[in-house]
Amino acid sequence: MIYIYKEELLIYFKNHLTLSIDTSKNNFKLYQNKITVNHKTYYFKHISKITLKEYLNEDYDTDTYRERTLWANWKNDKF
Protein backbone atom coordinates (compact mmCIF):
# COMPACT_ATOMS: atom_id res chain seq x y z
CA MET A 1 0.00 0.00 0.00
CA ILE A 2 1.29 3.47 -0.90
CA TYR A 3 0.69 6.35 1.47
CA ILE A 4 2.02 9.86 2.00
CA TYR A 5 4.02 10.04 5.19
CA LYS A 6 5.57 13.49 4.83
CA GLU A 7 4.89 16.66 2.83
CA GLU A 8 7.38 19.41 2.17
CA LEU A 9 6.56 22.80 0.69
CA LEU A 10 9.38 24.21 -1.45
CA ILE A 11 9.50 27.91 -2.31
CA TYR A 12 11.99 28.73 -5.09
CA PHE A 13 12.99 32.40 -5.03
CA LYS A 14 14.20 34.37 -8.06
CA ASN A 15 17.57 34.92 -6.36
CA HIS A 16 18.10 31.10 -6.52
CA LEU A 17 17.42 30.46 -2.82
CA THR A 18 14.98 27.73 -1.82
CA LEU A 19 12.92 27.63 1.35
CA SER A 20 11.91 24.17 2.54
CA ILE A 21 8.93 23.91 4.92
CA ASP A 22 7.71 20.77 6.68
CA THR A 23 3.91 21.03 6.37
CA SER A 24 3.26 18.89 9.45
CA LYS A 25 5.01 21.44 11.68
CA ASN A 26 4.19 24.73 9.91
CA ASN A 27 1.03 26.49 8.80
CA PHE A 28 0.89 28.01 5.34
CA LYS A 29 -1.76 29.75 3.26
CA LEU A 30 -1.70 30.54 -0.45
CA TYR A 31 -3.28 33.80 -1.53
CA GLN A 32 -3.64 35.44 -4.93
CA ASN A 33 -0.33 37.32 -4.77
CA LYS A 34 1.46 35.97 -1.69
CA ILE A 35 2.05 33.00 0.59
CA THR A 36 2.21 33.16 4.38
CA VAL A 37 4.17 30.66 6.44
CA ASN A 38 3.75 30.93 10.21
CA HIS A 39 2.67 34.58 9.87
CA LYS A 40 5.66 35.51 7.66
CA THR A 41 4.65 36.78 4.20
CA TYR A 42 6.44 36.06 0.91
CA TYR A 43 5.21 37.89 -2.20
CA PHE A 44 5.02 36.12 -5.56
CA LYS A 45 6.99 38.89 -7.29
CA HIS A 46 10.08 37.47 -5.53
CA ILE A 47 9.21 33.80 -6.18
CA SER A 48 9.80 31.64 -9.27
CA LYS A 49 7.88 28.54 -8.24
CA ILE A 50 6.14 26.86 -5.30
CA THR A 51 5.94 23.07 -5.20
CA LEU A 52 4.65 20.44 -2.81
CA LYS A 53 6.88 17.39 -2.42
CA GLU A 54 5.02 14.34 -1.13
CA TYR A 55 7.14 11.51 0.22
CA LEU A 56 5.53 8.16 -0.50
CA ASN A 57 6.20 4.92 1.26
CA GLU A 58 5.26 1.58 -0.22
CA ASP A 59 7.01 -0.38 2.45
CA TYR A 60 9.52 0.57 5.10
CA ASP A 61 12.52 -0.11 2.84
CA THR A 62 11.81 2.27 -0.04
CA ASP A 63 11.16 5.98 -0.08
CA THR A 64 10.00 7.74 -3.20
CA TYR A 65 8.43 11.12 -3.74
CA ARG A 66 6.40 13.13 -6.21
CA GLU A 67 6.62 16.87 -6.61
CA ARG A 68 3.60 18.91 -7.70
CA THR A 69 3.70 22.55 -8.78
CA LEU A 70 1.25 24.68 -6.79
CA TRP A 71 2.22 28.01 -8.35
CA ALA A 72 4.70 29.12 -11.00
CA ASN A 73 5.69 32.45 -12.47
CA TRP A 74 5.29 31.53 -16.14
CA LYS A 75 6.69 34.92 -17.23
CA ASN A 76 9.97 33.97 -15.61
CA ASP A 77 11.68 31.19 -17.58
CA LYS A 78 14.10 30.34 -14.77
CA PHE A 79 12.75 27.13 -13.25
Residues covered by each model-derived region:
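Mixed-charge, low-complexity intrinsically disordered segments
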Residues: E54-F79
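Alpha-helical protein-protein interaction elements
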Residues: K34-T36, I47, R66
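Phosphoinositide-dependent membrane-docking surfaces
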Residues: T41-E58
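Anionic N-terminal interaction surfaces
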Residues: M1-Y31, D59-T64
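Short polybasic amphipathic segments
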Residues: E7-I11, N33-I35, L70-A72, F79
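Short aromatic-glycine motifs in intrinsically disordered, low-complexity regions
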Residues: L30-Y42
